[in-house]
Design a protein with these regions (language model features):
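Alpha-helical, largely C-terminal catalytic domains
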Residues: 1-191
Length: 191
């Protein structure tokens, strides 16, 4: 291999999300991964510094979030209704993501592979629930932004995503919802 890993990561900007929905503005997995990293870092800090709960390193949570969709460089973005249609499809797609992640790791110099392995394969232990919460929060924010632009296409997704976040029972996520989410509904002059 010619160390294609970083070049492929640069192509994240070409993989759009929400492919089954009419969007007022597109979102790619590079933008999404950045937002998830910011949110994962925030959730970990909230958990540790505001709620006083044990938490993994917030900086490592941000790094885990940066790579949480890296396998989609090779697989594309599978729409959620398909990915989670039933347990068999979910398990099969997880296997596809794992194979894609292994393939990405092969594109790194061997000396770097172990440093990236946990992040690319999402084997991040106690960081994973925070990254998953941040991922869901990012999806919710996308719904809110689309609704704010007058797009009712995201109304059902907004309700379903909010319900899914509440089911996660993550106190740091609930704190963010209660204290930080409302400003996403405001325009620039209102902020």
């Amino acid at each position: 291999m010619a160390n294609e890993f970083y070049a492929l990561l640069g192509r994240m900007k070409y993989i759009t999300r929400w492919g089954l929905m009419r969007n007022t503005f597109s979102e790619n997995i590079q933008e999404h991964s950045h937002q998830v990293a910011v949110l994962a870092h925030a959730l970990a800090l909230i958990r540790r510094d505001i709620l006083g709960l044990p938490t993994p390193d917030p900086d490592k949570c941000a790094v885990a979030a940066l790579y949480h969709d890296a396998s989609e460089i090779l697989t594309g973005d599978m729409p959620t209704p398909i990915k989670y249609y039933n347990p068999d499809i979910k398990a099969a797609y997880k296997q596809v993501e794992r194979i894609a992640g292994e393939r990405l790791l092969e594109m790194l110099p061997e000396a770097l592979r172990d440093s990236y392995r946990a992040y690319v394969l999402e084997d991040v232990g106690d960081m994973l629930p925070i990254v998953k919460a941040a991922d869901k929060l990012s999806a919710y924010i996308k719904c809110v932004e689309e609704q704010k632009a007058g797009n009712t296409e995201f109304d059902s997704a907004e309700k379903a995503t909010l319900a899914a976040m509440k089911q996660m029972e993550r106190p740091e996520l609930q704190w963010f919802i209660d204290n930080c989410l409302e400003p996403f509904r405001l325009n620039l002059d209102q902020l």
